Amino acid sequence: DTKSLTMTFEATKFHENAFGIMFGGSLAGMFDIAFGTLTAGLGDYSVAPTVQLSTTFLKGIPTGATVRTEVEAVSTGKTIMNFVGKAYVGEELVGSASGTFMTPRPFKKFNTEK
C-alpha cells in the first residue's frame, strides 16, 4: 500500500533530555521524516514542504529504545496532503501526530548569483 509507511528510529544518547528520556522534538522530527518519506511514493517529486505538524506525546521514550512510526495519507489533493501517524516502543503507543504538507508544484530555483 503506497499510502502508508512504517519506519524505525533509534533513540540515542544524542536525543536525551535532562530527564534521561528522548526529548519531544526528536519524536516530532521522526514523524516529519516519516511523513516526508511517504510523500515520495505519492507523486513524482522529492520535496513536500511541511505546512503544519502536530505531535502528541503520550509516554516517555527511554534512551536506547527503537521507535516505530506508522504513518498514512488521509488525503492527497492537488495542493495539500494530510497525514496521520502513531509511534510505538514495542507494542506501547508513545505518541501520535498529524501533518499537512504542500503538494509541490514546479518551484523557481532560488538564485543567489546576481
Predicted regions and their residues:
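Hydrophobic residues positioned within well-ordered beta-strands of beta-sheet architectures
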Residues: 5-7, 53, 69, 83, ...
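Catalytic strand-loop segment that frames the active site of acyl-thioester-processing enzymes
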Residues: 1-22
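HotDog/MaoC-like acyl-thioester-processing domains
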Residues: 61-63, 72-114
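Compact, glycine-rich, soluble single-domain proteins
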Residues: 19-36
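Hydrophobic beta-strand-centered segment that forms part of the acyl-chain substrate-binding groove
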Residues: 36-68
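A short, acidic/glycine-rich surface segment
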Residues: 17, 39-40, 108
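Hydrophobic residues in beta-strands and at strand termini
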Residues: 9-11, 57, 103
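Residue-level preference for beta-strand/loop junctions
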Residues: 3, 47-49, 65, 79, ...
